Structure formats: C-alpha cells, structure tokens
C-alpha cells in the first residue's frame, strides 16, 4: 500500500471510531484536532487500526506516535 491508500483506509477507521464522517486526516492531525479523541478513545482507535491493517503496534510505537503522519509511517514500514 502506498501513503495515499493507507490514508484513505485510516480515514475510514477514524470516521468509524469517532462516529464522524467529516473527519479529514493529514500527517499533522493530532488528538487535539478531533474533539472525541481522548485517552479512552485512543485505545479504541489503536485496536481498530490494528484490526483494519491486520497488524499489532508495539507499546513503544503507540507511545511514540505524535500525529497521524507518524502512524502512517509505521503502517508503511509494516506493509513492506
């Protein structure tokens, strides 16, 4: 998958988890940009992303993600 394909799929996951069809992701999107994205929803989001992409993040990866761009970078590395 290329970056654009991952972003499209990830956008669908975010829209589903946060029940908001208006969400548009960019590399710089953070939890501050999405009202419903709190610490509890973060757990749901990570689980949904792992399920959608059929992979598991390490704790180091999860704690190190500062924005959507970093999440996409990890997903791209795993897709290789």
Residues of each region from the PLM?
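Phosphopantetheine-dependent thiolation modules in NRPS/PKS and related acyl-activating systems
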Residues: 2-37, 41-47, 51-80
């Amino acid at each position: 998958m290329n970056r654009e394909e991952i972003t499209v799929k990830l956008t669908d996951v975010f829209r589903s988890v946060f029940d908001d069809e208006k969400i548009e992701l960019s590399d710089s999107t953070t939890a501050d940009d999405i009202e419903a994205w709190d610490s509890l929803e973060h757990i749901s989001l990570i689980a949904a992303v792992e399920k959608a992409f059929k992979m598991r993040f390490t704790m180091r990866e999860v704690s190190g993600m500062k924005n959507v761009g970093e999440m996409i970078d990890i997903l791209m590395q795993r897709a290789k």
